[in-house]
Swiss-Prot record:
Protein's UniProt name: Small ribosomal subunit protein uS11
GO biological process: translation
Any one GO MF annotation of this record: rRNA binding
One CC-aspect GO term: ribonucleoprotein complex
Similarity section: Belongs to the universal ribosomal protein uS11 family.
Binding partners and assembly: Part of the 30S ribosomal subunit. Interacts with proteins S7 and S18. Binds to IF-3.
SUPFAM superfamilies: Translational machinery components
Transmembrane segments: none
Entry function: Located on the platform of the 30S subunit, it bridges several disparate RNA helices of the 16S rRNA. Forms part of the Shine-Dalgarno cleft in the 70S ribosome.
Record-annotated disulphide pairs: none
Key words, A-Z: Ribonucleoprotein, Ribosomal protein, RNA-binding, rRNA-binding
Organism: Alteromonas mediterranea (strain DSM 17117 / CIP 110805 / LMG 28347 / Deep ecotype)
Amino acid sequence: MAKAPARSTRKRAKRQVADGMAHIHASFNNTIVTITDRSGNALAWATSGGSGFRGSRKSTPFAAQVAAERAGVAAQEYGLKNLEVFVKGPGPGRESAIRALNATGYKITNITDVTPIPHNGCRPPKKRRV
């Protein structure tokens, strides 16, 4: 059986993006940080669960901070400088994720809350009785 000729594989150069957007989805159970370019194509993402936190530790502000740092470091190879931040959800990791992105070295130009608010849509879950 003949072997296929070996192709030379070179790592493709990452495209350079100056401005980007950071989408922070902070739920009660997890925090998802996605960094995209201006048109919404994902460059890097990280979650609290994927950062090594399991169970109730996923929903802590520190887990959100670690996830935001990981996403920020992964997106730095695209040459990002400025970030516009969109925050969605009521979770505990909202503020700490923004602070972590700021500490990673990005210039945050705008922070927008895009939490979906129903105009009396679905019935909310029943109240907990402990």
